[in-house]
C-alpha cells in the first residue's frame, strides 16, 4: 500500500483553503487532515495530529505564518503560500521547503508537493541510517 502524506492547510482566505483542498484531493498520495483559518487553531492541530506537509499562508489575522514557523517545535515540511514573493527568502531561512504564489497554479502546486515529499523521504532515510549507526 502506498503511503499517504497528511496535509494541513492554513489560510485566512476561504477561497484559498477551498482551492488548495481541491488540489490536495486530486493527488492520490495526499490526505487532507484539516483546514484552518488562523494560526492558533493550526498549532492545536499540529500538536494533536501527525502532519507531514503544511501549506501555510504568511499573512493571517492572529499570528503571521513567519511567527508560526518560529513557534513550531517539530516542523512538518512547510510550503508557504503568499501573494508576496519578497517573503520567500526569509521563509527559506526558517526551513520552508518551497512556496506558492497566489493566485495558485496546479502544476506549481504539484512541483512544491513533490519537493516536500522528497524532503520528507530524505529525512526519513537519514533518520533510519542514523538509528542504524547508533546501534552499531
Annotated model-derived regions:
Residues 35-44, 65:
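Helix N-cap/capping motif at the beta->alpha junctions
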Amino acid at each position: 500500500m502506498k503511503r499517504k502524506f497528511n496535509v494541513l492547510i492554513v489560510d485566512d482566505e476561504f477561497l484559498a483553503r477551498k482551492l488548495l483542498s481541491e488540489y490536495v484531493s486530486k493527488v492520490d498520495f495526499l490526505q487532507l487532515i484539516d483546514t484552518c483559518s488562523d494560526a492558533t487553531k493550526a498549532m492545536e492541530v499540529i500538536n494533536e495530529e501527525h502532519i507531514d506537509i503544511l501549506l501555510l499562508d504568511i499573512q493571517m489575522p492572529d499570528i503571521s505564518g513567519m511567527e508560526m514557523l518560529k513557534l513550531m517545535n517539530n516542523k512538518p515540511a512547510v510550503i508557504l503560500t503568499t501573494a508576496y514573493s519578497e517573503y520567500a527568502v526569509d521563509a527559506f531561512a526558517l526551513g520552508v521547503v518551497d512556496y506558492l504564489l497566489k493566485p495558485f497554479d496546479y502544476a506549481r502546486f504539484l512541483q512544491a508537493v513533490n519537493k516536500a515529499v522528497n524532503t520528507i523521504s530524505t529525512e526519513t532515510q537519514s533518520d533510519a541510517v542514523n538509528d542504524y549507526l547508533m546501534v552499531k
